[in-house]
Amino acid sequence: FPEEVLKCTTGFGTGMGGSGNVCGAITGSVMAIGLKYGRVDIENDNAKVFEKVNDFITRFNGRYKKQDCSGLTCAWREKGTFKTPERRKFCSAIVGFAASELEKVL
C-alpha cells in the first residue's frame, strides 16, 4: 500500500482511535470496497457499493455477531487485559477473516 493509505488508516485501530466503536477491520474493508466500486461523481449511483458493503457486513456478522471493538473484545476489556498477546491474536484473526471475506466480495 502507498504510505498515505497506511497513514490515513492508522486511526482505525481499537475501534476508531481507541474509542471501542466500529472494528477497524470493517472500516478498512469498506474503504477497499469503495476504492474498487465507489463513485467519483455524486450524480452516479452508489447501489453497487452498498450491495458489496452489505454483503461483507453480512459475512462478518455471520462469524462474529458484533461490529464494535468493545463488543468483540469485551472479555479482555472486562478483565483489564486488553493489551495482551491473546487479545492481539484474536484481533489478528478478525483482520484475517475480514481480508478473506473482502477478497470474496471484491
Give residue ranges: language-model regions.
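Acidic-glycine-rich active-site phosphate/pyrophosphate-binding loop
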Residues: 1-11, 69-75
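A short glycine/serine-rich beta->alpha loop
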Residues: 12-20, 83-87
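Amphipathic alpha-helical interaction elements
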Residues: 17-18, 41, 61
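Short glycine/serine- and small hydrophobic-enriched flexible loop segments
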Residues: 30-38, 100-104
